[in-house]
Amino acid sequence: YHFLQCTVASFSTPVLQHQFPVLSVSNAGDDGAGDLQAVFTNCIFWGDVGVADEVLISRQGNTAFQVHFDHAILKQEHYPDNVDTTSVMLNSDPLFLKTDYSNRAYDFHLQSGSPALGQGKDTGPAMDLDGNGRPAGKQDLGCYERQ
């Protein structure tokens, strides 16, 4: 699996509390453990105060297992076990445009000054979720390119 330019975020609302990691990766299933290769490039994994470690990695057995975070922001107290990392920032608030708990208003575009700006690899896709082109060279992390 190869995930590019993902923004994965979870925030509590007045009705629901955020209490589980936004990403859980495991090579175990109902029929036992299997091979796993997953690469996350130019991604953001973030949540509010409900969870300290937003990424959970679980390896079972002795099968082939590779999880790699390449240019990413993780809300994480420490690097998860069983992963490789390249240019990963831990606990660097990505500064989303709006995370308004009271009004249940969320906008995961990046503010100016976000540590995610210009920190990605030039790997594509060529456009963000709004249809805006991504520049050659250092792209923003996440699914939106700041305009």
Model regions and ranges:
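Predominantly extracellular beta-rich ligand-binding scaffolds that present long acidic/polar faces
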Residues: 1-109
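C-terminal accessory segments
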Residues: 87-147
